[in-house]
Amino acid sequence: MSLPAISLYTSPPPGAVYSSEFDPSSRGSSPPCSTAPPSTSHRPPAAAGGLSCLFSSPAAAASPPRAPPHDELGALWQDRSDEPAFAGGGGGYSSSPLKWRDLHHHHHHSPVSVFQGPSSSPAASRSPPASWLAGRDRDRERLFAGFVRNALGSCVDYAPALSPRSEVGGGELAFELDENLAEASPACEPCARELLAGAQARHRIFHEELVVKTFFEAEKAHRGQTRASGDPYLQHCVETAVLLANIGANSTVVSAGLLHDTIDDSFIDYDHIFHMFGAGVADLVEGVSKLSHLSKLARDNNTASRIVEADRLHTMLLAMADARAVLIKLADRVHNMKTLEALPLGKQQRFAKETMEIFVPLANRLGIASWKDQLENLCFKHLNPEEHKDLSSKLTKSFDEVLITSAVDKLDRGLRDAGLSYHNLSGRHKSLYSIHNKMLKKNLTMDEIHDIHGLRLVFEKEEDCYRALDVVHELWPQVPGRFKDYISRPKLNGYRSLHTVVMSENVHPFEVQIRTKEMHLQAEYGFAAHWRYKEGTCRHSFVLQMVEWARWVLTWQCEAMNKERPASLGDSDAIRPPCPFPMHSEDCPYSYTRQCDHDGPIFVILLEHDKMSVQEFQANSTVMNLMDRVGTNTPRWSPYRIPMKEDLRPKVNHEPISDLNRKLSMGDVVELTPALPHESLPNYREEIQRMYDRGGFALATRGGSSRR
């Protein structure tokens, strides 16, 4: 089956999002499936990046069908609604004439190899071929048709709204897929086969034996389950897995994405997954289940409204679990956020607030810009609908197509004249929420923001970035004070790039970003892209990635300090972390020390009297330390007071314990329940209160007599 080409930088495919965190009562029987065939109007990105060894996967294929999502705890079901207009797929207005057939025979078929394309040389410039230039005017209308819509969403670059394959241009990658779908497949509903076929058309990894096997297991587990919208629950599982595939996840992670809700929402348990698919998949699914449980507790207790506890929570989520489980949880939430319209307004806002306070920081710390932008824009829409609508309208009116196209042409000529060969030159735009946030923080109008639209230039080598910067400043006058060198001074999450603002011929400022391929992968896909890119240079990259991950978790304190620092003190970028991921500062004391053991503060979830809190303890703290703190902080006159630790029956991660010297670990859930039966508590508490009152009165009387 031959499919249309996709643009290299297209952002993750749009799709309905479903969350298991929603209303359990909306579970129902699934009607006859009405899954639509895969759409060709949006294209997923070429999957680039991924955890080394763990995150290597085939390249992305063609376009995705729209589907629903699932987010948190398994028993929750949510409607799928029409996808928000701003959440559409984006892509790159690319001048890079790469062909899939050139990459297909490359030795390494990882997402990164797709991104790299054929090797470049000065003699073979990446400039647009003559045929592309000749047809540019013809394609310009479709090329920019979806720009403003994409700008309102989470896309990173401009993407042509591709129609049938006859319109494939020279700057795109043509993908040829086999027509073979899953071979021997168990009995399942017709709609499930349609979902599998759609996933296989969107990404090759869904042809792999393990992924096909887990797909049918997920279908069996969720058979008959529907979301409030009436869509099959399985559709959310598929969309979550597709999101993971598009950032370079391997078959183990994609399989866990398909099964991520089975422990919570079906008859399947850890042992079943372990025996069917091995420890790798089972451990990830169990990890996601625990993360979902913590997220549900946080939502029920409105943890997002308490800044300190919210910061502790997303730090804990990063540190406690396999990073891949956190990625699956994030993909789950991205998909769920796209279908909030089906929920009551109050639930929409509560869910969006939790996403903004907990999951956006998670995506930011992982460095996955495309997911972070999607989540921010969706939260902005639900939390500030009027501001969102107004800013969307202004952005539509301010879009200047002529400025972008003329700037691309001018820079392309200048780079060729300077003998510089680039990997990709594309238009880019700032996300809607980023514009809104910048206007608030710096008290600016939309006209005063200079980086709403701009260009992005990607090179093979770092030195070419600085040479290209000189070319840019020769072509356009530089706006004073607007140059930032994030290559020599990376951001907290490892972001590296050169940013400069220049003035166009019509005296309109625009931004130019210059980076290498490695920097681009890091910016778009975070830590996974970095390790995947480096995999070929180190035989022990799995060990290195774990060390780098442990080091990076240490920077949470710097991020918290940035958050609390008054805006009046200046740019928050002035505060630098000791270890900007994934490198170390030269003077960092941890550069050559072992980082695998966690010796910093630990965060645990405390459940007491049906209330949840996120508590911070020193390393090596025990359950006894926690109970001492609870006893100290509980007022004696509280009707819920249980005065002696011996009267409490602690549970850690739902298991009763007898050894109070057990050490606490990051992410433990500690429940303190009374040892007495629940029905005896009122009388017990009243008697203890009377005893205390009588004893306290007698003590005060004796003390007063002795003083006289």
Swiss-Prot record:
Q: What induces it?
A: By jasmonic acid (JA) and infection with the fungal pathogen Magnaporthe grisea.
Q: What InterPro entries does the record tag this protein with? A: HD/PDEase_dom, HD_domain, NT_sf, RelA_SpoT
Q: What is the organism of origin for this protein?
A: Oryza sativa subsp. japonica (Rice)
Function, as annotated, reads: Probable ppGpp (guanosine 3'-diphosphate 5'-diphosphate) synthetase that may be involved in a rapid plant ppGpp-mediated response to pathogens and other stresses.
Q: Which reaction does it catalyse?
A: GTP + ATP = guanosine 3'-diphosphate 5'-triphosphate + AMP
Residue numbers spanned by region Disordered: 1-50, 109-134
One GO cellular component term of this record is: chloroplast
One Gene Ontology term of the molecular function aspect: GTP binding
Q: What is this protein called?
A: Probable GTP diphosphokinase RSH3, chloroplastic
The family this protein is said to belong to: Belongs to the RelA/SpoT family.
